[in-house]
Amino acid sequence: MKDRDAGGRPAALRRPVDGILLLDKPEGLTSNAALQRVRRAYRARKAGHTGSLDPLASGLLPICFGQATKASGLLLDADKTYDVTIALGERTATGDSEGEVVERAPVPAMDAASVRRAAAGLVGEQEQVPPMYSALKHGGQRLYRLARQGVEVERAPRRVTIHELRLLDLDGPRLRLEVRCSKGTYVRTLAEDLARALGTVGHVASLRRLALGPFDGRQMSTLAEVEALSASLADLDALLLPPDAGLATMPAVQLGVAEEALVLQGQAVFAAGPGGSKVRMYGPGGRFLGVGRMTAEGRRLAPDRIMVELAASASVRA
């Protein structure tokens, strides 16, 4: 049947929703499957997720609704924080516990001090080669599809930054650490690198995302909680953060009535702000208009992404 959503609901019954839900994605579910279940509960016309999580991983997955999807790409550049458990002594094809064991090695005796020294050597900017089991493309095909066919191709290294790698627990051949890293970092590769620095091999046994950009786990809702409220749209909407919540670290520029009108027409205006920076734009009364960019000298503002329809929902919940 034509024009139905993922749950079989006619498109006419879907509604406009604007805002951001901080979902606690459960293990064993793809990010897209989680997105579709949330979208179905909200009966939302438009939704997308920011910062995909592997099925094995759990934790913070921001779901952007409506016009908030226009700003979701900006969150992809944000730093992320993970709680990871690494199992030493076995390397798998996928770099996590879902893959076949392809190498075993003895685990040398170690204490917390030796683990911290090895971890310190991985902190900072570095070149990281993405794993074959990843969603990156080569020749139009996903790398993980090639890997499943037994094909391995050369992957260009990517520059990433490990801001912090902190040991939380050492229990025999298992290490638990907190990782704060830049976009594009593969924690599975980092786990293998740390195991190698400790004189053995290893893989990710569990992974949980704790934070992404300005968001942390304190405001997350579980999938079960969301679906339990599906009969009460008002209660569901009360879980939403305003659309500009994901831009909290971006400088803000306040515009007057005349400047607001010009910006909404796509025209640059005179305004003071940090030179060369992207900024949040607000009109009279503090309504969120979208994202703009200041010129190098910081005296003119050009609109980048107009999100004026979001203004009405900016008061959903701070």
Annotate the PLM regions.
Residues 134, 138-163:
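Extended alpha-helical targeting/anchoring segments
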Residues 40-42, 58, 62, 152-184, ...:
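The conserved catalytic core of RNA pseudouridine synthases
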Residues 46-76, 132, 145:
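Glycine/acidic-rich beta-strand-loop module
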Residues 68, 74-128:
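Acidic, low-complexity central loop/insert segments
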Residues 63, 84, 140, 190, ...:
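Residue-level signal for inorganic ion chemistry
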Residues 84-86, 165, 177, 207, ...:
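A structural signal for short, well-ordered beta-strand segments
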